[in-house]
Amino acid sequence: MFWTWFCFPFPWILYAIDPSKFSSWTQCINQTVENYGNIGSLLAGLTAIASVLLLYETLREQQKSNQHNEFESRYFKLLEANRKTADQMKWTAPDGNEYHGSQVFQIMLELIENSYKTLTTRDLPSESPVPCLPWQGVSVEQKHFINIAYKVVFWGLDTRGKSILEKSDANDLISSESIRMLDARMGTSTTGIRLENGGFHAYTGHYFRMLYQSIRYVNEQDSLTYRQKYEYVKMLRAQLSNMETAVLFYDSLSDLGADWELSWQGANSNINKQLITKYNLIGNLPDGMVPRKLVKKFYPNMKFSDEPMTEERCKLKKMYA
């Protein structure tokens, strides 16, 4: 109240003393008010711009969150579907015995190993030279015998399986004569199962396609760091039994599973598509299940869970995306 009564007569007193000073004083006030008005307009504009930027950032973060939630939702569905496919797998042997889940992979692994041993004890014909292999310590015959052993078990040695193997253009060691020799030598395994049945393609083909697509889906997520991708793939890897992991190893060495890594070695080298090594997909495999020396021949930079980190592996981790 005091300041109201004090300030109210002040302009009039100033006008009575010197009208020119009163005019200057009013002009100063008007200029000040005008300046504050300009500043207010500027601040209002800046506030509006800040609001738009804040809204944009909020929407962008919300979009990222939605995309991440969508990725996780789809990935966990793939995990569930892949596990269900493995658990519900059923294979009926020619003698009528049924094998379920991991038992199917156990039988398949035994047949692959028996087939490989059979192949290495025979001289299979080759009609044309085979190009040199990029893996140190791996002979041409060893790689091709692994490929044949897996494909024979996958397709089987029934009429259709033999036809597929004979028409294969990915391996010139496979010929009609070779198939006849395999058919004669590959008798029964210790479980009494013969290879004249239709093979395992109807049971494991879908499983391995789904497994590959699940890991590839994670690998292609540009919004994730390599560390984040590794943790997601680690969830899937933890679901695999030792038998599944061992069969996966042989699958990755065959023509059928070359996209796991071998297709991206050598001339077409792309470390970010070499999924076996990048995500240590067979790193939990016990040494007695598959010879570790054999694994290291094809995947020298893959780290087993009980091994220390090598210098080369550390370099790769920094390069992975």
Placement of each model-derived feature along the sequence:
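Juxtamembrane interface helix immediately N-terminal to a transmembrane segment
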Residues: 1-7
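Amphipathic alpha-helical "stem/stalk" segments
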Residues: 12-31, 64-321
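Hydrophobic alpha-helical segments of integral membrane proteins
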Residues: 13-15, 44-55
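N-terminal membrane insertion elements
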Residues: 28-49
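Transmembrane signal-anchor/signal-peptide helices with a preference for the extracytoplasmic
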Residues: 49-69
